[in-house]
């Protein structure tokens, strides 16, 4: 099976001035067609280093896809260096030259000589039309390798690749397989623990493959299988998925690109369950997160940020006796906050966050000690304690996600 390498040319990429989004786009498109990308390479606008990269890439890859370096300036060197490497001439493409000439003429502007370079191609190439710019792309087969040259700007590269390069590449790749992937999302278990639970599967993996990634207070597992048909690949993925669920399914919250807050918000909207929030150490993070989603005004009625004892009492109407006897970092305070915000905002669910963000301790409780209260109309109010680390903002973000998870667990249990 053919292997591909994406070579991004541009010093600005190495300096971090531009993110290499082209490589991600091309890799995803090729994966959908069963073509494996094994290497991403970034090289600056330097002739010698680009030559070295080409030499290395040819030894390990069948398909070399270049992005960038096709423009009119002196540092646009991709086609010149590749032509020299392949011992081929550069020739003018009449169609693109006419496009460039007409563009400048229609605007009564003088075309500089260097703009003509964008219509120059490597001899023997199949020209890839640029529908959104001037620089012509190229598709070339030589010495058992396929070379594809694409412009750097994503607005030009993406349509050129999708409309012209990809169909050619897929038709040439007669041994293509189908690649099928599934993303599983877990909360409440660390990456190291999940990896340990799946260790024997990861060590023995061939097809499908299993990869774990640490996300924002969650763990993502990607299962990828290849087969001759989509049905065969899906069957391989599903078999592995079921074994993962058997081991750690209690921590699974969803699939694909849907985040935990987005999933829970959709569940609340679907069931038309209203919600409000009372926040202390999270200082409005939960409310800011839930407010990100369209249509939220149908179910999110509002909330309160009561950071001090005084505002907990005066605004949220938490009993002074509750705070005096138990402190603000307590089950009793969390429950009362959740009940009161639900009553004051007239909502089905009230959720509260109180605790020690860190790095210092509070009321004898170490940093990272938090309580989340959950009040649901018709059910007993509950409070849940968690102990995290000393990183203040990490604790706040994690608590918010934990709050969404508690709501999801309630909704799953009481359908």
Curated annotation (Swiss-Prot):
InterPro entries with a match to the protein in the record: CinA, CinA-like_C, CinA_C, CinA_KH, Competence-induced_CinA, MoaB/Mog-like_dom_sf, MoaB/Mog_dom
Pfam families: CinA, CinA_KH, MoCF_biosynth
CDD domains: cinA
Coiled coil start-end: none
PANTHER family xrefs: NICOTINAMIDE-NUCLEOTIDE AMIDOHYDROLASE PNCC, NMN AMIDOHYDROLASE-LIKE PROTEIN YFAY
Family of the protein in this entry: Belongs to the CinA family.
Record-given protein name: Putative competence-damage inducible protein
Organism: Listeria innocua serovar 6a (strain ATCC BAA-680 / CLIP 11262)
